[in-house]
Curated annotation (Swiss-Prot):
Protein name: Mediator of RNA polymerase II transcription subunit 31
Gene name, Swiss-Prot/TrEMBL: SOH1
Species in which this protein is naturally found: Yarrowia lipolytica (strain CLIB 122 / E 150)
Quaternary structure note: Component of the Mediator complex.
GO MF, one example: transcription coregulator activity
Domain of life: Eukaryota
Subcellular location: Nucleus
Amino acid sequence: MAEVATAEKPVTDGIQDGSEQPDRSLRFEAELEFVQSLANPQYLSYLAHNKYLESPEFLNYLSYLEYWREPKYARFLVYPNCLHVLKLLQYATFRKEISRPDFAKQLMDEFYYAWIKPSEAGVFGDDDTLEGLKREDSQAPPGQNVKMENKDGDGDVQMA
């Protein structure tokens, strides 16, 4: 597994000249792998439970990863819904909610539904949901800030 670079410990594997510059391809691969891991609600829940989503340094790193939205980088993404999650992680309300197992499952169900019926699904993280998070960010107690609606009648949960 690839070693992840930090400010204190850059990755130098694969550098032929022995310099302290991180190997760009290794960094690219590590950041690609990490940003795509954000498409996994169970991993998001893990991050929340282990307080990573409360760390200013980690939140700053998430902001840095916004460059993946640029087409020259986004073309490498296999799981483009990770970009929706990257946007949602900007909101404290979402960061609090994702620690709840039912909310993580709801997000997983939403991703699954969008995958099997892309033309019918309201993708979690759409403009209405984001506007709701902006208004309610840090103002509502956990569990009371995202409305759920069953739109298709077969038990799949959709965001209202």
